[in-house]
Amino acid sequence: FIFEGGVSLQNMNISGGGEKLNAKNSSFDYLAMQFRLHPRVAMSIGLLPFSNIGYNVSKNNEPTSTSPYSTKSLVGEGGLHQLYVGAGVKILKNLSVGVNASYFWGDMTRSLTMLYPNTASANSYISQTTVSVSDYKLDFGVQYTQELSKKHSVTIGAVFSPKHKLNNDYTVTTQVSTTNSNNLDATLELPNVFGVGFTYNYDKRLTVGADYSLQQWSKAKFGVNTSDDAVRKEFNETYTYCDRHKI
């Protein structure tokens, strides 16, 4: 029986437009346990954050000849949680296969606020985007171990997670003189993930290994069905999604 967990502390410095800001954030990393059900069957259960958002940035705009004094703030919070159950089976002497079933849930909120505290004739503006996610995904893996001699062995493995569209509720709320709230049809996908790795073991006392993974974010789809140009721009122009490589 193996039990482990972890937490993270983040210190972030942001600069731009002559402004410098510091943000501190802490987050729960993971909680996992592993145990055997049978000499050929093992199981794992874990809870971990899949993504997190945490920022609060504000800026004061001094009055000019064309615009009054204003304050602008950007706030983001929330994230996705992942609960998984995995099982591995040794189907041959040297060959094992496994599968993880994960459940995702969580809310992510981002807001933009423009206030004109000293000018009654100027309307303040608030825009808030909330995404609620509740869905699942599957991961598959295979592992093969070859004994080279009595004290030397090599293990190779591969994992694959198929692309999956997340079930979500996407809501945009705006407030100027009145409040409007719209539920939109948004597409949020998790990418295909491929991974390979190997380890070398000497006499069960020394293990050396390496692994590589590829997350194909550039091929995942993100979009929203709306006639609001500002919302479409947030998806189509603000972000560039790149593949993620990890060694």
Feature map (PLM): residue ranges:
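Outer-membrane beta-barrel porins/channels
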Residues: 14-20, 28, 36-247
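Extracellular/lumenal carbohydrate-interaction signature centered on repeated Trp-anchored short motifs
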Residues: 23
